[in-house]
Each structure stands twice: as C-alpha cells, then as structure tokens.
Amino acid sequence: MKIIIKILYRIYQLLIALPLFALITIFTAITTIIFQHWRNSWWLHDIQAFWSRSFYYLLFLPVRVTGQENIDSHTSYVFVANHQSMADVFLIYGWLPVIFKWLMKAELRKVPFIGSGCKAAGHIFVKRGNTAAALQSLQEAERVLHDGVCTVIFPEGTRSENGQVGRFKRGALQIALDLKLPIVPISLSGCYEVMNRHEVFANYHPVHMHIGKPIDISTLAEENIPTAIEQLREAVIEGMDK
C-alpha cells in the first residue's frame, strides 16, 4: 500500500504540483523584476515568501517554526543555517520573518527566471574560489545590510551528503565580523528526508526550522575565531532537537 501511495504522490508531483509551481515561479520572477525598485519592501517580500511556501503547500508537507521571538524584524543579522537539501531554501525563504538577501553561488544567476528574479530581488552572488569577486560581494553586502535587511548563508558551502551537519567554513563568521552584525543560528530538520541531493521527487515528511538567539561577535578576537565557528556549528546542531 505504501508503494502505491508513493507512486501516486509522485504522479501528482509531476502532473499537478510541478506545473503549478512553475507558473508561480514565473509570476514571482516577473513581479520581482517589474517592481525591483521596491525590492526591500514587505509587500514584495511577502510575494516571494508565498512562492517559497507554495512548495510546501503543493506537496502537503507539514511545517513547524520555532524561535521567531528571538529576533527583531528591524535589526540586521547574519543568519547561518545547516544545508540538508533544496527544500531548505523554500523553508527559510517562506518562514523566516525578516527581509533578507541570500549570499548565493554565482552559477544560480544562469537559471531561467530564478536567476533574473534573484538579481532583481537584490540577492548577492558570489564566485567561489575568486578572492577579488568575494571582496566585491562583501562590499555589496555592506551597502545592502542595514535597517533590518539581513543575509542568510549556508556555512557548509554545499548540501549534506547524509543529512548530518558538516564542517563550517570561516566565511559566514568573517562577514558578520566585517559588517559588525550579530549572527543567528538557524537549525533545519526534515528537509533531507523530503528531498536529498540525489533525489528528483519529494518525499512526504514534516520539516522544522528553529531560529536561535542572536550572538554578538563584535568583540571576538582573531585567535578565537576557530573556536567560535565550532560553537556556532554546535548551536545549529542543538537547535535541530528543539
């Protein structure tokens, strides 16, 4: 019986959910491009958030979010999250209650509609392995991240192979230090079970996002950065059990 339900669920995804999500994606991208002058407005952000939420709505996936009370929507933060699958993006974009810009790999700029929409929305593209381009991205972030506009980073750098939290790279902490912004851990669970990096179809599974408490790193000394990175990783792992 479970096999039959799984087959029917995949047929539904292919014939109904995917076409509807594609239409919503095109509508959201076009709307964002047309109204990009208001890229930091709540009404445009809400349209983009609905696009992300529609991924979960169309697949009937239960979503639970905790820790919203830990942050202030008028304060700029650097959010760091574990990266289990593509489903992470839709969970964060749909339910993180702040206006934010992704720090995302430059290759995504070439994806039809999504790349153009992300550029119009003001998300920050980073060329990995290019120091000069990374510096330019940091300078762009300095211009954008103020008055409650935040950024979200996946410090592992790539999706998890097994759902476990990998090693955190220094970049996220360095950006928070350079911009003098508090850093907030986000813990995601269930997204790997929904769609890991090797799967094309989604699986039915509940997901959870926990927003941790802001961490002030403005006085962090250089020699303490490796320890702080590991403590941040531990905070993300701990939040997965909330």
Predicted feature residues:
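Catalytic core of membrane glycerolipid acyltransferases/transacylases, capturing the structured
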Residues: 25-49, 56-60, 72-131
